[in-house]
Amino acid sequence: MNKLLVMLAALSLTASCNCFKPEKRVHRLLTDRTQTLAVAESCTGGSIAARFTAMPGASAYFLCGVVSYSNESKAELLGVDPADIARYGAVSEQVARQMAEGVRRAAGADYGVATTGIAGPSGGSAEKPVGTVWIAVATPRETVAILKQCGTDRGQIIDRASAFAIGLLRDCLNGN
């Protein structure tokens, strides 16, 4: 019984230090490699930037965060092609990729992360329901994008999309 209590206490202490959050791993990888990051967020509204800048030492790698909520800001600030927004929609793989590449280029960063999605409660459709989120990471070698369904509650969607984006960046940094 005592051994079980010690194990539970150790687990509780470990969990409370947030050692398992993906942003901690990304923070360490970018800092150790002296590489930089910029983010472009639509549906996550700055949540990704907030998660990184909340950590001491983020200024070593975090260059900027752009909340490009409107289609116009995606085009003007990030260089997203308005024709692609019209053709595929703001919530699309093409737009997410261009956002990530655009923020990476504009900031001169090694990595660019972007999210675009439908956080709800309205705005969804049969093709793109509430909770649909495209996430992209632009690296020095390539740009990768994933589609995620992040639930139906606005707060949950923002939290999950942010976590998925940071996880995708971590995977790219790890070479996966």
PLM region descriptions:
Residues 2-7:
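Sec-dependent signal peptide recognition
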Residues 8, 17-176:
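Short alpha-helical segments enriched in small residues
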Residues 13:
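RNase H-like, Mg2+-dependent phosphodiesterase core
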